[in-house]
A protein has these predicted regions:
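Aromatic/acidic polysaccharide-binding cleft in carbohydrate-active enzymes
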Residues: 355-371
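Conserved, mostly hydrophobic/aromatic
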Residues: 183, 220, 256, 284, ...
Length: 460
């Protein structure tokens, strides 16, 4: 693995200045996961570094970039539709540059489709190419030809890429990239590549800078944060990294995502228990409640092992809450398998579930598996699952009433005159307060609940 630092490209900056009568504007739209959102922030930072301003409407832009997601095929089709809708704008606006980057651009069939069917797309580069964007723009401006990079995964981590963060008090901080798990339903390892971890010193430096800049919540990102450290010269795992970061003085809290159950450890739970800066919430995607299906998914754990981890966390971290991902209707799922999922959901008592009806993803092993279950039956199972989960979540929320809690105030609530914030257990509360509190911590007494949203009163 090679570690390099981003360098300002003055040649690109000069070409950008020369190409436009007024400072050009860029519109960047990111689809998908939090990692993509963070990539989008870095893309914006790189563009600003070579002289672009940023705008919120594509029709105002001189450069339009779609930072894409490849997890689901219908998401890809939506992107192609949005790119197609720009054809007329491209014809009307002289010099408009259109680009597509991110996970979709790391697939050969996508690049070929763009090459053949979308001649007005000027730039294409993958997830590892953010630091090369100035060079690609310079090449386009110099040669006036399309620059479509072939999919490639670089054994490189680029540090100190400029960034334009969307929030002034919440920040994303990637600690690793890629995934080695190859779950049979998932395209991510094929488009984001194998796992590669940032050096702990580089992470610590960025983290310390965020704390010193006043950020109140920092979320550590990785496709599987629990496997952090593999391949590093230093013997450091994810729990070690958390303890290292929590030693930084300041008023902040840390979240992280995503945890893979096969790599989650007692050592991680012990860190959550010991460190006040770590939020007492664990997102632990189980996917289903059937050992047989977990094996078909290539998840490498059993329901028994998963429950042992849940029970250990409950014992060590009083009040900890859990969330998870569930796939309904995976190929071969029987009613008995689904009942296992319902039982697991009831047993764990998740505060929140992210649920999906299985959709075939070309390029994955699951796409080749027989899938005889009718769509209507899958939809019925999803309805039953959501009913069970809604009852569990509402009951857990009601149990919070009466507590006085520390809340990070994030924005406006749904009701007039209210603000919204999150507890460290990831629940949302609304309360009347001055908007000046946004981005700070507040003490809130929980007085009631509306469905899965808590209601409270500001403590003064």
């Amino acid at each position: 693995m090679e570690y390099i630092n981003f360098e300002h490209n003055e040649t690109a900056a000069e070409l950008v200045r020369a190409a436009y009568d007024t400072p050009p504007l860029a519109f960047v739209h990111s689809y998908g996961c939090q990692q993509n959102v963070n990539d989008g922030e870095r893309i914006k930072g790189v563009l600003v570094d070579i002289g672009y301003g940023l705008c919120d409407k594509p029709e105002d832009a001189d450069l339009i970039l779609f930072n894409t997601c490849a997890v689901r095929e219908h998401a890809e089709q939506r992107v192609f539709g949005n790119v197609g809708a720009l054809k007329g704008l491209k014809e009307k606006k002289r010099g408009l540059m259109i680009g597509l980057c991110g996970c979709m651009a790391n697939q050969k069939h996508v690049v070929e489709k763009l090459r053949k069917s979308y001649p007005y797309v000027d730039l294409v580069f993958g997830v590892d190419g953010i630091d090369t964007l100035p060079q690609l723009i310079a090449q386009k401006l110099q040669k006036h030809k399309r620059v479509l990079m072939e999919p490639a995964q670089r054994p490189v981590i680029v540090e100190n890429i400029p960034i334009r963060r969307e929030s002034e008090f919440r920040a994303w901080l990637p600690i690793m990239y890629g995934c080695d798990n190859f779950c049979t339903y998932c395209i991510v390892p094929y488009v984001r590549g194998r796992e590669k971890s940032r050096k702990p010193g580089d992470i610590l430096a960025e983290f310390r800078g965020l704390v010193e800049a006043g950020y109140k919540e920092i979320t550590l990102l990785g496709q599987n944060v629990n496997s952090y450290g593999k391949g590093l010269e230093e013997q450091v795992d994810f729990a070690d990294l958390l303890n290292l970061l929590c030693a930084v003085p300041g008023d902040y809290q840390i979240r992280f995502m995503t945890s893979h159950p096969k790599d989650a450890s007692h050592k991680l739970i012990d860190a959550i228990a010991a460190q006040p800066h770590l939020c007492k919430h664990l997102h632990l995607p189980v996917q289903c409640g059937s050992d047989e299906l977990l094996k078909k998914m290539n998840r490498h754990y059993t329901i028994g092992q998963y429950m042992e981890l849940i029970e250990y966390a409950r014992k060590k971290v009083p009040g900890i809450t859990f969330s998870s991902d569930i796939i309904v209707g995976f190929p071969g799922e029987t009613e008995e398998d689904f009942q296992g999922t319902l039982e697991l959901v009831k047993k764990v008592g998740y505060m929140q579930l992210f649920t999906f009806i299985y959709s075939k993803r070309t390029g994955t092993k699951a796409a080749e598996m027989p899938d005889p279950t009718p769509r209507a039956e899958k939809t019925d199972r999803m309805t039953r699952l959501l009913k069970v989960q809604d009852e569990i979540a509402m009951d857990l929320v009601r149990q919070q009433v009466g507590r006085t809690v520390r809340v990070l105030v994030e924005g406006y609530g749904r009701s007039d005159g209210t603000l919204s914030g999150r507890l460290d257990n990831n629940l949302t509360v609304e309360f009347a307060a001055d908007p000046a509190l946004m981005g700070s911590y507040a003490q809130v007494h929980l007085t009631g609940a509306r469905a899965t949203v808590l209601l409270g009163e500001l403590e003064t």
